[in-house]
UniProtKB/Swiss-Prot annotation:
Localization: Cell inner membrane
Assembly behavior: The system is composed of three essential subunits: KdpA, KdpB and KdpC.
Organism: Polynucleobacter asymbioticus (strain DSM 18221 / CIP 109841 / QLW-P1DMWA-1) (Polynucleobacter necessarius subsp. asymbioticus)
Disulfide cysteine pairs (residue numbers): none
A GO cellular component annotation in the UniProt record: plasma membrane
Topology with respect to the bilayer: Multi-pass membrane protein
Function per UniProt: Part of the high-affinity ATP-driven potassium transport (or Kdp) system, which catalyzes the hydrolysis of ATP coupled with the electrogenic transport of potassium into the cytoplasm. This subunit binds the periplasmic potassium ions and delivers the ions to the membrane domain of KdpB through an intramembrane tunnel.
Entry protein name: Potassium-transporting ATPase potassium-binding subunit
PANTHER family: POTASSIUM-TRANSPORTING ATPASE A CHAIN, POTASSIUM-TRANSPORTING ATPASE POTASSIUM-BINDING SUBUNIT
Gene Ontology MF, one: potassium ion binding
Sequence similarity: Belongs to the KdpA family.
Keywords assigned: Cell inner membrane, Cell membrane, Ion transport, Membrane, Potassium, Potassium transport, Transmembrane, Transmembrane helix, Transport
Length: 596
């Protein structure tokens, strides 16, 4: 472990806490209708939106109405983005003349951005027009982030309220979190990125002359422009060279800001945050990883304020930080090791495993970024996870298997962790013979059924999807690396989709009707198959009477509960995947020293 890695992580946690604490208080004030929302200019904008949309902000919803409204809202978003891709060829802001996207890819992308997954089976700069990127994908980045935040706010209200059958107004919650939190921060963030070197324009792509002539092997073509092949079917190649390069342009900074802040992760370019137009400098790289955890950390403080016990928020946050530190140090350690396969070929391994990494970021910043982006449901990358060492790739895969509850996505991480907190209290109650209670609310059979559904949905989707893929011809056809790593690529894809992360072991050819359809199904049910039971929990807790603290109440604000909560997350959340992990990265690591 290098000094640079340790100092970076320490600085990161320190700055994160300094920024998250006031933001958490601000979110509490915004969602309760205080602070900035009471100022006349902002109140006018908010009320104008309600009037145009026909919303009565005074009417609250039951959990079922809240859930139906949220699902319907996201279905409309899916249909809009799907249609935008199908007709982008005839729409404006398309200087490259990019054609319409195929129906299966459009379906996958529309689901992906609506569920905050941002899985991308396409090449952004070669597929999506500026209009599609801005009006479709960037808009969904805001709305999907807001959708996650309002769900956790509703759950917190459930804990805070006493014998009330409503959990808030969905449309008011969506409006306020977008108008007062996501948009203002994103505007400032985008300006910062432009200052660092990110681009923001509507220019056509630029052809430039390179400093050096690039030499490479190019396929030989026949008169019809088709590649020539030898008698064995291999493509014939010949030497070629060029001094020309095409530089893609576009409104990058505005999409990049909400991509990171909203833990969306979908890049404007195929290389994502490894591309210098998205992530130009070490400072922009630090701010990007900081922004991934900013709102998830702030919501822990919001939680403590809303339930009138700040200690509860600190317990959840400390649990998240401890798990984050453990897996991040592990990621840096594994990637700092030389690849024995390359070492046997005489390659100097002193720098560690630099394959798939930007030299400007190196081992430390690439590994830290990988750990953060997979703990959160972000999925943005500044290096290629598929090129990590077997155990280095194990870490981001395992991070997602925890259920995206260690900080996790905006909103989704905290409500996922609170689900595990309920389970931890229930398990502790069984062990010591106490009636399980959490935050003054009794936990009964209905609540535990909802907890079980919320926890089991994602592993079922990930493992069943992986099993179907490895047993089907279409699934196996996408594997470029047969063996343990090929299995890991499929497992990673379905784990990423089901947990709404969106990162990939990109060696898998996933832009096919099979994977576009299967992964879209995993993304949709991985999102709303958890949201619905969480909202059901919110409604159930809101309707319950608060129970006064007594001698039989288990304390949930001390070090013991931190250990219990972390143990529950690790044992229950990740053990479902142990057999699959044994077939993938673990066996690949064991085989590594004997590969020649």
């Amino acid at each position: 472990m290098s000094t640079h890695a340790i100092l970076t992580i320490v600085l990161y946690v320190g700055v994160l806490l300094l920024l998250a604490y006031p933001l958490g208080g601000f979110i509490d004030a915004v969602m309760s209708g205080q602070s900035i929302t009471s100022k006349k200019p902002f109140r006018f904008i908010e009320n104008f939106i309600y009037k145009v949309c026909g919303i009565d902000p005074a009417i609250e919803m039951s959990w079922l109405s809240y859930a139906i409204g949220l699902i319907a809202f996201n279905i409309l978003g899916v249909l809009f983005v799907f249609g935008l891709q199908l007709f982008q060829g005839i729409l404006p802001l398309n200087p490259q003349g990019l054609v319409s996207v195929s129906p299966d890819s459009s379906f996958n992308t529309a689901i992906s951005f609506a569920t905050n997954t941002n899985w991308q089976a396409y090449v952004g700069e070669g597929t999506m027009s500026y209009l599609t990127q801005m009006l479709g994908l960037t808009t969904q980045n805001f709305l999907s982030a807001a959708s996650g935040i309002v769900v956790v706010i509703a759950l917190i209200r459930g804990f805070a309220r006493n014998s009330i059958k409503t959990i808030g107004n969905l449309w008011v919650d969506l409006t306020r979190i977008t108008l007062y939190v996501l948009v203002p921060i994103s505007v400032v963030y985008a300006i910062f990125l432009v200052g660092q070197g990110s681009i923001q324009n509507f220019d056509a792509y630029k052809d430039v002359k390179t400093v050096e002539v690039a030499k490479f092997d190019a396929p030989k073509l026949d008169a019809d422009g088709q590649p020539l092949k030898d008698e064995k079917g291999a493509v014939l190649t010949g030497p070629a060279s060029t001094d020309q390069q095409t530089l893609p342009m576009g409104p990058v900074a505005s999409q990049e800001a909400i991509k990171m802040l909203g833990t969306n992760g979908g890049g404007f370019f195929n290389a994502n945050s490894a591309h210098p137009y998205e992530n130009p400098t070490p400072l922009s790289n630090f701010i990007q990883i900081l922004s991934i955890f900013l709102i998830p950390a702030a919501l822990c403080f919001t939680f403590g304020r809303m339930v009138r016990d700040k200690r509860q928020g600190w317990v959840v946050l400390v649990t998240m930080i401890l798990i984050f530190l453990t897996v991040t140090f592990a990621a840096v350690h594994f990637e700092s090791q030389a690849n024995p396969v390359l070492t046997n070929l005489g390659v100097d391994g002193a720098m560690g495993n630099m394959e798939g990494k930007e030299t400007r970021f190196g081992i430390d910043d690439s590994s830290i970024f990988a750990s953060i982006t997979t703990l959160a449901s972000c999925g943005a990358v500044n290096s290629m996870h598929d090129s990590f060492m077997p155990m280095g790739g194990f870490v981001p895969l395992w991070n997602m298997m925890l259920g995206e509850v260690v900080f996790g996505g905006v909103g989704t991480g905290l409500y996922g962790m609170l689900v595990f907190a309920i389970l931890a209290v229930f398990i502790a109650g069984l062990m010591i013979g106490r009636t399980p209670e959490y935050l003054g609310k009794k936990i009964e059979s209905y609540e535990m059924k909802m907890v079980a559904i919320a926890i089991l949905v994602t592993p079922i989707l990930a493992l069943v999807g992986t099993a179907i893929a490895v047993m089907s011809v279409d699934g196996v056809a996408g594997i470029a690396n047969p063996g343990a790593h090929g299995f890991s690529e499929i497992l990673y894809a379905f784990t990423s989709a089901a947990n709404n992360n969106g990162s990939a072991f990109a060696g898998l050819s996933a832009n096919t009707p099979f994977y576009n359809s299967m992964l879209a199904i995993a993304m949709w049910f991985g999102r709303f198959g958890v949201i619905v039971p969480v909202l059901a929990l919110a409604g159930a807790f809101a309707a319950k009477k608060k129970i006064a603290v007594n001698e039989g109440t288990m304390p949930t604000h001390g070090p013991l509960f931190i250990v219990l909560l972390a143990g529950t997350v690790i044992l229950v959340g990740a053990l479902n995947y142990v057999p699959a992990l044994a077939l993938g990265p673990i066996v690949e690591q064991l085989m590594l020293p004997v590969i020649h």
